[in-house]
Amino acid sequence: MSSAFDFEPQPRRASVAVDVGGVIVGGGAPVVVQSMTNTDTADIDATVAQVAALHKAGSELVRITVDRDESAAAVPKIRERLLRLGLDVPLVGDFHYIGHKLLADHPACAEALAKYRINPGNVGFKDKKDKQFAEIVEMAIRYDKPVRIGVNWGSLDQELLTRLMDANKANGFPLTAQQVTRETIVQSALLSAELAEELGLPRNRIILSAKVSGVQDLIAVYAMLSARSDHALHLGLTEAGMGTKGIVASSASLGILMQQGIGDTIRISLTPEPGGDRTREVQVAQELLQVMGFRQFIPVVAACPGCGRTTSTVFQELAQKIQEDIRSSMPVWREKYPGVEALKVAVMGCIVNGPGESKHADIGISLPGTGEMPAAPVFIDGHKAMTLRGPKIAEDFQLLVADYIEKRFGHGQAAAE
């Protein structure tokens, strides 16, 4: 019979720490949130604006595409512009096909980037593969940059896959095609890391990833990879999709892996809707880490889902307003109110669970449900503090939340202590 302890998060897998532009990935450091731009990197204004938005939203590393000379030439200018804005965000260069040439031809780009991403599936083909891989590794060594060896099943090393499929056939097909593909992904990452180390790249300058688009495949591949390597691991479900589907698929797969102690940095690869906000993927990554109890980024707003007792939309509107105010205020609050990330606010819709949930929050309100008296008890630090009445209950509660934050986390409180 399983005990309750069997369902606790497993200890973090031991991994080698990698310094990426001052951000530590692996080695027991908090799981790092990263993202990627979708601008043309050669468009310096657009790329700077998006990197800034992603970083301000909470992305600790930002990856940019470096696919041609114009993009490579823009990288140091992007880095310089960001620094002038006071944004020292590590930039990761995403290279495919000609990364070796771009790094060699643009030394300022090689210097400005905090990390290089190499895809073993398209770094080169046949006789050129190992040579071009080696050239990128040599550039990483020269500029003392870490490398992410990022395998993706959409661009998997076909020579390795064919070799393993043929071996499986010779052995009488003990493995399914899906299992052989998973093994190919893992071997591609491990063999590439082994080659990089043989070329002189230190172990603490290598991060591995092995991305697929199927939830069960991703869980299996990373379980295999984590058992056979102590390299820091970058988690991400590739081509997760749009909207709810992408969020659910990424959260399910990454959540299971992190519960098992696997993963040192994550990216939520959402397909944005036309004109959509690219920072959404950062918010989802932060929410995932926070709801699982691994990190705290922003105060939590607990709110009931509503039912027949809550035909009024007042509690929904108040919960939304509080959540929006908190998120928009966090860039300032992080500096002004240290520790505010731990705050919990409850906005409940009726008497059934409202008072109880509000008592569990730092500050909470139980709004009147259908047929209830037009009064809303407010609980602060587990005790009923007052009852709000009248047409401005929502506005009054917002002022109470602001006052609570100032008193608990402001400089006045720090001085009193």
UniProtKB/Swiss-Prot annotation:
Cofactor remark from the record: Binds 1 [4Fe-4S] cluster.
Domain of life: Bacteria
GO biological process, one term: isopentenyl diphosphate biosynthetic process, methylerythritol 4-phosphate pathway
Coiled coil location: none
Cofactors (names): [4Fe-4S] cluster
Pathway: Isoprenoid biosynthesis; isopentenyl diphosphate biosynthesis via DXP pathway; isopentenyl diphosphate from 1-deoxy-D-xylulose 5-phosphate: step 5/6
Catalyzed reactions: (2E)-4-hydroxy-3-methylbut-2-enyl diphosphate + oxidized [flavodoxin] + H2O + 2 H(+) = 2-C-methyl-D-erythritol 2,4-cyclic diphosphate + reduced [flavodoxin]
Residues at which [4Fe-4S] cluster binds: C304, C307, C350, E357
Keyword annotations from UniProtKB, A to Z: 4Fe-4S, Iron, Iron-sulfur, Isoprene biosynthesis, Metal-binding, Oxidoreductase
GO molecular function: 4 iron, 4 sulfur cluster binding; 4-hydroxy-3-methylbut-2-en-1-yl diphosphate synthase activity (ferredoxin); 4-hydroxy-3-methylbut-2-enyl-diphosphate synthase activity (flavodoxin); iron ion binding
EC number of this enzyme: 1.17.7.3
EC class name: oxidoreductase
UniProt record similarity statement: Belongs to the IspG family.
Function: Converts 2C-methyl-D-erythritol 2,4-cyclodiphosphate (ME-2,4cPP) into 1-hydroxy-2-methyl-2-(E)-butenyl 4-diphosphate.
Protein name: 4-hydroxy-3-methylbut-2-en-1-yl diphosphate synthase (flavodoxin)
